[in-house]
A protein has these predicted regions:
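Catalytic-core elements of nucleic-acid end-processing and repair enzymes
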Residues: 1-179
Length: 179
């Protein structure tokens, strides 16, 4: 119950936000049921791909809900498209988070990464890549070297399949004249 008219708008906004969160939680639960392997895959890849540097860190999400929160926070398509869930489930690509180490819980960039550490996409707010990403390039190269040392033969085989699928997808986009 709202006793003061001036608080009505605030209370309305709070309730709308609660409803959005509840809807997103239900959507995350449905996606997690549909793609049951994702949480396990995230646990499995965490020791290989997670890495902390002085300025930047690579964080592995714990599952569907973390990925959806990242997409919502950065207002981009990760977490809204079955294509990403399918790629994770098939271990064709993984979604990882590039964060500033000092603000480890604050979304910065979302990465789509192949099993060998090849970065397919780097996106921040509104599917953009800003100039500030150049500051992280050296860190990302360092991270890729570390990941390369951690890979198993199975990871390398998955990476080869992933590369072929990526090239096929690019060719299909060219044929469809999608820019």
């Amino acid at each position: 119950i709202v006793y003061r008219v001036k608080l009505l708008r605030q209370r309305h906004d709070e309730l709308v936000e609660q409803l959005r969160k509840r809807e997103r939680d239900m959507e995350a639960a449905a996606t997690a049921r549909k793609y049951r392997k994702i949480a396990g895959i995230c646990r499995l890849i965490k020791p290989k791909y997670e890495y902390t540097g002085e300025v930047y860190s690579i964080v592995v999400p714990s599952g569907v809900r973390d990925i959806m929160r990242e997409g919502d926070a950065l207002s981009h398509c990760v977490g809204k498209s079955d294509r990403y869930w399918e790629r994770i489930e098939q271990q064709e690509a993984y979604i990882l988070f590039l964060r500033k180490t000092a603000e480890i819980d604050k979304p910065y960039y979302t990465l789509e990464v192949e099993p060998n550490g090849t970065i397919r996409q780097k996106r921040t707010y509104f599917d953009r890549q800003n100039e500030d990403l150049k500051d992280a390039e050296q860190f990302l190269k360092e991270w890729q070297k570390v990941v390369s040392e951690r890979l198993t033969e199975s990871d390398r085989e998955k990476a080869e399949k992933s590369k072929v699928l990526r090239l096929q997808e690019f060719e299909q986009l060219r044929q469809d004249d999608i820019r």
